Each structure stands twice: as structure tokens, then as C-alpha cells.
Amino acid sequence: MIDLREDTWTLQLYAQRYKGLSPKNSRELQLRMEYDPLKPNLPTSGEEQNSKPEWLNTPPCLIPESESLDKAKGALVGLAIGDAIGTTLEFLPRDKLHVNDMVGGGPFRLQPGEWTDDTSMALCLAESYISAGRLDITLFREKLVRWYRHGENSSNGRCFDIGNTTRNALEQYLKHGASWFGNTEPETAGNAAIIRQAPTSIFRRKSLQRTFADSDSQSMATHCAPESMASCQFLGFILNYLINGSSREKAFSPHVMPLPVRVLLINAGEYKEKKRDEIRSSGYVIDTLEAAMWAVWNTDNFHDAILLAANLGDDADSVAATTGQIAGALYGYSNIPKPWLDKLVQQERISNLAEQLFYMAPEEDF
């Protein structure tokens, strides 16, 4: 095992043992990875279609549609549940306080069941898919702006929590227009894009490559740092497998895909051997992704996964929201504790949005 905060050169040397997880580079692969988020242009037929690498083949749905729907609803509602539980400990040092229920409070003095920016951004993303029938980044950004300025899609009518990188992205979008794509520097690799990932994975459940492309693009709406985009793509893969009925062991097994070194090491599964004091829960996207995978791997039900994640403290709401997406897709909406569902603000609306995304999912088209 290695600490993912080691310098990149050291990590790259260490990661040579996992070189089999990186796909062989080719012109066809480069063409597939080069797309404009404002004008998606993936291959749809002919020779380009036949060149799709095996690792991008969509896994078959192994379960009845009703069970897959339950998992899709679990992913989005689970996100909001984790957010609402984790906010109590947001910004607190680890083990200063603990939670064992949805109690509200925290730095924003929320009521039990109210949630933060994690869920607000996910709802903006879900609504943009439903309105456009695809990922329209400009529409998504406009919905984010309305949340930021007017409190739309918030739990209490106010935008009371927004990350610095997200705020900067929206201000730059308002200043420069739809062609602006920034926040590319490594230090901007926060977790705001992975915490809203679930709608993309639900809508694109029938196409792994569309999941891969849309995950990248939805991140670019605010976060263009490579680790942010790759973390969304990796989480998109995990959710795709789980919504389609794969076991935890299958979904969490190493996948072949092009990833920067820190995400590659998470993909390799080194977190499975780490102890709690080796897991960080900061707002850095790598810390959040690793902590969420670790929490789901080390529990066997939704309830325990969320509490294990939230009680890591620090960026507790985002770690628990990311955990909630994974655990919700694994165990399903029907296995989320009913008392938590009853407390969750706008629970029925969130569940209905997930169902709309599920039934709108386009067929594989290339």
C-alpha cells in the first residue's frame, strides 16, 4: 500500500505494478477520448464503432428492471441521505463528535433532513438531463447559477453552502460565457463534481462509454482538473456496474481504463487493506473517493456505510454523500432505513427524479 499524498513521481513508480490496468494507447482510443463537452461527437457507426475497446463494453443488466430501478433510486436518494447525515459533522476534526442518526445542526444549523450543496448540484444535473434529454452543459450551468443566486434546488430556499472552486466557475461562466472551461490546476481538484455524479450514471445506465463521456463533461462544468474528471469517470463506472446488478466484489474489482495515477491506485483496490487512520476525509477529490470506497467495502449495509463515512469528519457531508451514491446503488432504495427516508427533505421529489432519469435512459447507440 502507498499513501496517495505521496508525490506524483513516487506514485508513478509504485503504480508500475498495476500497469495492466491501463489500456493500450491507440489512435482509435485517442479519438474516443477527444470530445467537446459543448458538442459531444462520439462515434455512432461504421469502422469507428467497431474500434470500441473491450473495457468500454457496457455490462449486461443482470437483474429485473424493477430491481435496477430500486438501485438507481437508491443512488440519488442515498446521495441526499449521506449529505443530510454528514452535514452535522462538516468541518469538524475527526472524532470530536459522532453521529448515529439524521439530526441536523452542523455549521449551517440545519433542520434534520435538510441537505447541502452536494444534493442541490445533483438535482440541477438531474433536471438538466430531464429537460434536454441529454447532458446540456450550458443548461446545467444555468441551473447551477439559479441555485447559487436564488436558492433554487436547495433544501431551505437559500444557497448557504458553495465551494470556492464552484463559485469561481459560475462567476467565470457569467463573465465569459459558455466557452469558459477553467479550474484546471491540481489545487482545484475538489470533490464538488463527484458528489453530484449519480444522475449521470442513472441516465447513462445503458452505455458505459456515454457514462464515461458525460461524467467527464459534467465535471468540466465547474472542475476541469484531471483528477476531478477522472474521479467522476471512475465513480461513473462503479455506479453503472451496481445499477446493472453487479455484486460489490465485481464492481469493486480493478477495471481497465485510462486514469491518472492516484485514481488508478484507488481502482487497483489498495484502500481495501487500509485502516481508518490511513483514510482521509478532506474535500480533495482523491481523499473523498477513497474514503467512500473504503466505507462501502468495510460494511455490509447502507446504514453502517453512511455512519462509517460521516464519522470520519472533516468534509463529512461530501464523503457521506459519495458513499450514499455507492451504497444506495449497491443495496437499493428499499434498503435505506425508513426513518431516514421519512426525515429527508423532498425525499419523494428526489426519488421521482431518479425514476424519470431511469426510464429516460437512451439505448446504447454506438
Swiss-Prot record:
Record has Protein transport as a keyword: no
Organism: Serratia proteamaculans (strain 568)
PANTHER family on file: ADP-RIBOSYLGLYCOHYDROLASE (PTHR16222), ADP-RIBOSYLGLYCOHYDROLASE-RELATED (PTHR16222:SF12)
EC number: 3.2.2.19
Residue numbers spanned by region N-terminal extension: 1-65
Family: Belongs to the ADP-ribosylglycohydrolase family.
Domain of life: Bacteria
InterPro entries: ADP-ribosylglycohydrolase, Ribosyl_crysJ1, Ribosyl_crysJ1_sf, Tri1-like
Observed phenotype of the null mutant: A double tre1-tri1 deletion is outcompeted by wild-type cells, but not by wild-type cells missing a type 6 secretion system (T6SS).
Subunit structure: Forms a stable complex with cognate effector protein Tre1-Sp.
ADP-ribosyl hydrolase domain as annotated region, ranges: 74-366
Variant or mutagenesis effect after changing residue 32 to E: Partially protects E.coli against cognate toxin Tre1. No longer protects E.coli
Purpose: Immunity component of a contact-dependent interbacterial competition system (also called effector-immunity systems). Acts as an arginine mono-ADP-ribosylhydrolase, mediating the removal of mono-ADP-ribose attached to arginine residues on proteins. De-ADP-ribosylates FtsZ, is able to act on other proteins as well. Neutralizes the toxic activity of cognate toxin Tre1-Sp. Expression of this protein alone in E.coli partially protects the cells against competition by wild-type S.proteamaculans.
Cofactor notes: Binds 1 Mg(2+) ion per subunit.
UniProt free text on domains: The N-terminal extension forms a projection that reaches into the active site of cognate toxin Tre1-Sp where it occludes the active site.
Reaction(s) this enzyme catalyzes, per UniProt: N(omega)-(ADP-D-ribosyl)-L-arginyl-[protein] + H2O = ADP-D-ribose + L-arginyl-[protein]
Name of the featured protein: ADP-ribosylarginine hydrolase Tri1
Any coiled-coil regions, as ranges: none
